[in-house]
């Protein structure tokens, strides 16, 4: 986990269509999000969201944070905000343990997905991620793990590239230092 991997991650993530921005702290991240997400925003209740009072920070910036079962949000939410477990620099991929349905919905329903990443969680490649993936799957319960590389895109039947057809049109990765170095925590 070095700056070398952070630079590679930024380069590749941008190449696959993500916006990557270094922000000073979570307050600055909330401000950034408020400049883009003007409507209802989904923020799943995760250990890191609770630990860092993410919902309160976003609400203080004027963001309409939906609380509850995201299936009942009532209309298409504009934004979704999540933390990640770790990233893989060589593909610009963000990895989230998404067994909780609200996490999955926050990453797929909105037009814009914001992912908060501690740069210490950027691994070199998928081989470096094997120990974390192994630990993630320990235990008897199956888990859902999402690999997100850029905004949603498809070129189905007619081979015409469409952005945002099966998920967010935009992916914003916000690099924030000192959030968490625990690869199991999101």
Predicted region positions:
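The feature marks the mature, well-folded catalytic cores of soluble enzymes
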Residues: 1-186
């Amino acid at each position: 986990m070095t700056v070398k991997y952070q630079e590679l991650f930024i380069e590749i993530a941008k190449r696959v269509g993500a916006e990557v921005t270094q922000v000073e702290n979570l307050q600055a991240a909330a401000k950034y999000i408020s400049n883009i997400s003007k409507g209802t925003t989904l923020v799943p209740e995760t250990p890191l969201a609770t630990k860092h009072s993410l919902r309160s920070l976003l609400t203080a910036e004027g963001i309409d944070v939906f609380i509850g079962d995201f299936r009942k949000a009532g209309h298409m939410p504009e934004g979704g905000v999540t933390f990640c477990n770790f990233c893989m620099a060589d593909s610009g991929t963000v990895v989230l343990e998404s067994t909780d349905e609200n996490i999955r919905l926050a990453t797929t329903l909105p037009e814009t997905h914001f992912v908060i990443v501690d740069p210490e969680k950027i691994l070199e490649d998928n081989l470096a991620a094997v120990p974390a993936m192994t630990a993630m799957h320990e235990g008897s319960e199956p888990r859902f793990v999402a690999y997100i590389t850029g905004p949603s895109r498809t070129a189905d039947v007619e081979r015409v590239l469409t952005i945002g057809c099966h998920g967010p049109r935009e992916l914003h990765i916000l690099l924030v230092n000192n959030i968490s170095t625990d690869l199991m925590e999101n």
